[in-house]
Each structure stands twice: as structure tokens, then as C-alpha cells.
């Protein structure tokens, strides 16, 4: 029986696991989290179950059905708290190295899997462009506000400003309201003209994305009900406070996202949640050797196959198009990975949904995609790399002194991107500042997460220890 | 207080009743409920920073909330560099502020 391993139990991975087992494979579903659902269906844990979890979710029933079906199926093994920390290619095959147990704990169980087929569904994290004061406590990524609201029922502040770009800001504002916060305003960087051109162009194409459009319309109605202003063409360009956020500066932006002088105003707030789009979690795909698209997502064909035989990809690592798209792509990927027929009615319907989703993703990008003018809200003392506290001024100085625009060499000299997050927060920003955006760039990371030396030591000796690139300390 | 948890009796999501636990944070007891992460317990108690950067001496807490940014690292029961946003709190956990992470690239 063909063994399919699926990494990631968000919408894409759940759908892939189900499609693969239905196509006759034996399936192992791994997720680093201790529950299923990924980012979209993040919910209170089983130790604190909610009576009405669906209040915070769309298609909660779909999730329940998928989760129940997978857990009940004899040919499916669901492994939660399973962190895949590296991927190797012994003899052209694929080996996943996994640690199962408490996050960052010691003495986790080590697992090595060599599947016949691999589906990567590792999702994305949100991306925040730096601005003066963004390192203050009280500044969060919008994803953090969302994760804490859904997964903890915690509101990150009382008076909260939501800012950045993209449709994601709407569910974040909604969750904050449902968690008892006051949302002072939602500031979208895209100007109304750009948004209209992106969203209203060829409206017939949107008919297929009716579910998503309805979801977004619902959020807008909710903002209006709560009298939350939604302001296009604006950004939070600075956060202020003594030790934590007390206020932010909001400014109007031009088409290029450069602040328009004289439009700045101060807004009192104790939290600000900022997201300018998403960055795919590409480590495993890059380690497997999968080709990337010019915009740095995993390149896939109509059957979600990557450029590497035996490896499929689905969900937001292949493009940012929302949960419906992730579900459809997962269905296609799982079917194909199991060696099933992607011309069956279900797989073909999913395939059509994938094409609609790609059109939707293109609209998000054209309406909300990052425009270069944001750089003009940086100051020389603005932190660019949060880990190493490297400032914009220091990055510019290094470029001037060394004459290099190569991300690698600027990182080594300025230390930007060398801290524990391994440039996950600042990597794309650095590349844009330097104009050095060729793939895989900062996305090549030998380890998906730091692993403690003790865990490495307990692994079978056949394992090459990738410690060379991470030599010091308790963790590597 | 800034960050806080939605009171169970007003929560439209209707979470199960609280099952109290206490963690020690830099020697001070902080109350939480079973199922919260360490970051969840701290934020619900209105605490938003629990790490100090070594270069700038600046306070940090949660930034990404999903285990990607490593801003939220704490020492838990003597083990450094634990991401507070991922680790579920257990009654009696001893949480200590830490400086720079030991993980270096
Ligand atoms: C914090 C956050 C909150 C979001 N909330 C919403 C929302 O409310 N509404 C909305 O429309 N969109 C939301 N999004 C956008 C969201 O990413 C997508 O709509 C959807 O979740 C994408 O599905 P996916 O299956 O591709 O990936 P995800 O749902 O991100 O699932 C990926 C899964 O892979 C796991 N994983 C990744 N790497 C590894 C590894 N190495 N080892 C083991 N497991 C791994 C992760 O733990 C995760 O569970 C959110 C995004 C983020 C980052
Ligand atoms: S808040 Fe980013 S890793 Fe915990």
C-alpha cells in the first residue's frame, strides 16, 4: 500500500489526507500544533472545549467532518505535536526528521519517515513591514491577534488599531470585536482606486468565489454595525510609547504607499495589529529541491505536483488564495499523491475551484500587494531585524561601506537576519531593500526550527548532524 | 490593564468552565486556566513583555503568536528558549525572564 505523508493539518493538509486515503493510500498526517485545523480553523484546545466554537469560524462543519473522518479511518495515522525539523534526500528519496512532543521540550520522540509520496501543506505566516516603534510591546502581527483571539480568547488590547494590507485585516478586526476589544480603525494601505481596479475588474470571474466574497461582505457589515471606520489609502507609520504602545501615527499614502506629508495624525491605542500580506513556509519544499515561482511560492502543475517527483504541494505555500482554495488544492494533491485518478468528478471539481482560486489570488495581489513607497516611512533608527536589533541606518551604512547589494553578505556584516528567527521576519524586507530578490534567497534554511543538542544526540547515528551551520549554545 | 481574556460568562464562544492553574513568573504567582499557553496566561493577566534583548535592553513579548518570530522566548522549569506562544502552561510551571536566546546561527 502506498504510504503518503502529509505535513500540515490546515485546510490544505486535511483535504489532502482525506483525498489520499479515499484514493487507497495509507496516510500519516503530521502537524506541529497539538490540534488540527491550521491557522484558519485555530480554536480552543480540547482541554478547554468551547460550546459554540462555530461563532468564530466559517465552514466549521467542514472542519469537524474532515477531522472526525480522518481520526476514525483505520488507514490514517494523525500525529499532533509533530515538528518536522528537517528533510533529507537519501538516494533521491525523501526522509523527514520529526520530533514529537511539547514544543521546544527536551526528550521528545524522534521519528524518521520515508514516504512513497509527500504532500507539503505547511501554510504561511503573515508579513509585517517594519516601521518606527514596531518593536514595542503592544505591536503585534495581525496573525498574532487572530491566533490569540481564536486559540486563547485573549484580546491583545482594549483600544486596538488594525493596519496593513489585504482582506485578512477584516477577519482580524471581527475576532477582536468578538473578544471584547474596541477596534479604533482598520487602515488599509491600498488606495480606493487600486482596490477598485483589482477587485472590480472582470467581475464575472468573481462569481465562482461567491463564498469568499460573502464572507468578506459579512465582515464589512460587522464593522459598520460596530461603527469601526475602514480607511483605504492609510497606514500606521509609527508606534509610540514608554516601554509599550500608547499611540500610533496614521498617515495617508500615495499610490506607491509613500506617506503624504502633512496628513499624519496621532491616534491613541494600547495595541496595534499589522500585516501586509503572507510569507509561505518554504523550508521543507526548498530542502526537497522544489522549484519556486518568481514570486517565491512553490511551483506546481495542474495536479499540484512540484518539480520534484514524489512531492506534491497545496495551500498557501503555493499562493495566497484563502481557505477554500487550500481545501480544493489539498483534494487534488492528495488524490494525485496517492496515485489516484485526478480526472474523477470530485478531483475535476476541485481542479476548477483551484483555477478560480488562482484568479482570486491574483486579485489580492493586484489590489493589496506591497508597493515600494513604504520605505520612505523608515528612519535611520528604525529596527529592521527584530532579533538582532539591526537598524535601517546600519543596513544602509553596510551597503555603502561594502558596496554590496547581496543579501547574504549584508546579513553577515550587519547581523540582520542572523538571529533565532532566521530572517523569517525581516528576510523579505532586507531583500527588497537591497533589490536582491532571486529565489530561493533567504528561504533556504537547513533547519525548520532550532533543535536542542540533546535531541540531535539521541538520533540514530546514520543521521548527519546539521550542526555545522548552527554551532553554538544549547540549541543548534 | 491592556491585553485580557474574554470573561467566560460573557463569551459568545462559550468555553468550558475555567480549571484554574498557577504559574510562577519571576517568583510571582500568575493565575490562568488549563489549556492556555504560557503567553496566553501572561497576556490574560495584562502582562505584555517578559524578555529583555541583550543589545538594546528592550522589552519583548508576543509578536507573531504562532511560533515564527522567537520574540516570546522564556525559561520554563530551568529550560531556556521555550516559545511561550506555543507551550501550554501547567500548574506550577516556573517561568523566568531570559535575555538573549542561546540559539545562534
Ligand atoms: C495566524 C494566522 C491566522 C489566520 N487566520 C485566518 C482567518 O481567520 N481567516 C482567513 O480567511 N484566513 C486566515 N489566515 C490565512 C490562512 O493562512 C489561510 O486561509 C489558511 O489557513 C491556509 O491553509 P493552509 O492549509 O495552506 O495552511 P495553514 O492553515 O497555515 O496550515 C499549515 C499547518 O502546517 C503546520 N506546519 C507547518 N510547518 C510544519 C512543520 N515543519 N512540521 C509540522 N507541521 C508544520 C502548521 O502547524 C499549520 O498547522 C490566517 C493566517 C495566519 C498566519
Ligand atoms: S510570538 Fe513569535 S514565536 Fe512566539
Give each language-model segment a name:
Chain A
Residues 124-161, 167-172, 294-302:
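Glycine-rich dinucleotide-binding loop and its adjacent helix/turn
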Residues 7, 30, 113-123, 268-276:
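Short hydrophobic core segments
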Residues 141-149, 271-321, 350:
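FAD-site-proximal beta/loop scaffold in flavoenzymes
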Residues 65-100, 179-276, 280-281:
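A Rossmann-like FAD-binding core segment of flavoenzymes
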Residues 106-117, 260-270, 307:
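Core beta-strand elements of the Rossmann-like FAD/NAD(P) dinucleotide-binding domain
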Residues 381-395, 414-432:
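Local cysteine-cluster metal-coordination motifs and their immediate loop/turn environment
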Residues 2-65, 169-210, 294, 424:
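Beta1-alpha1 glycine-rich phosphate/pyrophosphate-binding loop at the start
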Residues 314-352:
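A conserved FAD-binding loop/helix module that cradles the flavin
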Amino acid at each position: 500500500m502506498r504510504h503518503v505523508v502529509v505535513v500540515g493539518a490546515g485546510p490544505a493538509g486535511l483535504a489532502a489526507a482525506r483525498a489520499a486515503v479515499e484514493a487507497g493510500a495509507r496516510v500519516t498526517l503530521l502537524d506541529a500544533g497539538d490540534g488540527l485545523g491550521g491557522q484558519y480553523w485555530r480554536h480552543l484546545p480540547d482541554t478547554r472545549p468551547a460550546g459554540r466554537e462555530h461563532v468564530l469560524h466559517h465552514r466549521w462543519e467542514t472542519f469537524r467532518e474532515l477531522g472526525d473522518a480522518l481520526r476514525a479511518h483505520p488507514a490514517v495515522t494523525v500525529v499532533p505535536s509533530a515538528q518536522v525539523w528537517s528533510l533529507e534526500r537519501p538516494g533521491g528519496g525523501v526522509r523527514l526528521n520529526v520530533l514529537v512532543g511539547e514544543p521546544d521540550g527536551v526528550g521528545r520522540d524522534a521519528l524518521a519517515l520515508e514516504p512513497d509520496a509527500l504532500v507539503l501543506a505547511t501554510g504561511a505566516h503573515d508579513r509585517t513591514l517594519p516601521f518606527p516603534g514596531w518593536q514595542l510591546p503592544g505591536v503585534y502581527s495581525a496573525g498574532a491577534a487572530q491566533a490569540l483571539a481564536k486559540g486563547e480568547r485573549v484580546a491583545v488590547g482594549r483600544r486596538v488599531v488594525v493596519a496593513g494590507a489585504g482582506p485578512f485585516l477584516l477577519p482580524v478586526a471581527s475576532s477582536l470585536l468578538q473578544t471584547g476589544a474596541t477596534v479604533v480603525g482598520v487602515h488599509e494601505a491600498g488606495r480606493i482606486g487600486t482596490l477598485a481596479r483589482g477587485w472590480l475588474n472582470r467581475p464575472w470571474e468573481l462569481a465562482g468565489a461567491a463564498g469568499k466574497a460573502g464572507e468578506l461582505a459579512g465582515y464589512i457589515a460587522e464593522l459598520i454595525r460596530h461603527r469601526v471606520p475602514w480607511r483605504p489609502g492609510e497606514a500606521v507609520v509609527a508606534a509610540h510609547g514608554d516601554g509599550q504602545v500608547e499611540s500610533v501615527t496614521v498617515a495617508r499614502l500615495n499610490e506607491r504607499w509613500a506617506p503624504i506629508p502633512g496628513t499624519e495624525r496621532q491616534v491613541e491605542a494600547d495595541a496595534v495589529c499589522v500585516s501586509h500580506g503572507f510569507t509561505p513556509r518554504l523550508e521543507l519544499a526548498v530542502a526537497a529541491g522544489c522549484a519556486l515561482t518568481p514570486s517565491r511560492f512553490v511551483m506546481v502543475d495542474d495536479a499540484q505536483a512540484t518539480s520534484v517527483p514524489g512531492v506534491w504541494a497545496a495551500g498557501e505555500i503555493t499562493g495566497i488564495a484563502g481557505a477554500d482554495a487550500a481545501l480544493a488544492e489539498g483534494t487534488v494533491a492528495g488524490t494525485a499523491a496517492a496515485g489516484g485518478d485526478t480526472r474523477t468528478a470530485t478531483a475535476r471539481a476541485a481542479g476548477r475551484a483551484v483555477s478560480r482560486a488562482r484568479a482570486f489570488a491574483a486579485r489580492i495581489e493586484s489590489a493589496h500587494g506591497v508597493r515600494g513607497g513604504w520605505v520612505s516611512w523608515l528612519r535611520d533608527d528604525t529596527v529592521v531585524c527584530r532579533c538582532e536589533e539591526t537598524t535601517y541606518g546600519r543596513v544602509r551604512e553596510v551597503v555603502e561601506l561594502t558596496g554590496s547589494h547581496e543579501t547574504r553578505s549584508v546579513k553577515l556584516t550587519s547581523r540582520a537576519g542572523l538571529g533565532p528567527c532566521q530572517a523569517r521576519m525581516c528576510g523579505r524586507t532586507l531583500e527588497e531593500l537591497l533589490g536582491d530578490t532571486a529565489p530561493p534567497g533567504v528561504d533556504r534554511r537547513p533547519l525548520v526550527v532550532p533543535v536542542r543538542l540533546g535531541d540531535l544526540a539521541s538520533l540514530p547515528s546514520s543521521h548527519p548532524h546539521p550542526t555545522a551551520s548552527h554551532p553554538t549554545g544549547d540549541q543548534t | 490593564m491592556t491585553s485580557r481574556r474574554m470573561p467566560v460568562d460573557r463569551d459568545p464562544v462559550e468555553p468550558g468552565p475555567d480549571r484554574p492553574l498557577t504559574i510562577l513568573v519571576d517568583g510571582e504567582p500568575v493565575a490562568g486556566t488549563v489549556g492556555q499557553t504560557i503567553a496566553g496566561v501572561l497576556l490574560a493577566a495584562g502582562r505584555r513583555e517578559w524578555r529583555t534583548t541583550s543589545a538594546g535592553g528592550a522589552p519583548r513579548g508576543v509578536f507573531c503568536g504562532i511560533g515564527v518570530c522567537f520574540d516570546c522566548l522564556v525559561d520554563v522549569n530551568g529550560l531556556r528558549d521555550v516559545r511561550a506562544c506555543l507551550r501550554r502552561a501547567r500548574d506550577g510551571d516556573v517561568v523566568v525572564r531570559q535575555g538573549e536566546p542561546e540559539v545562534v546561527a
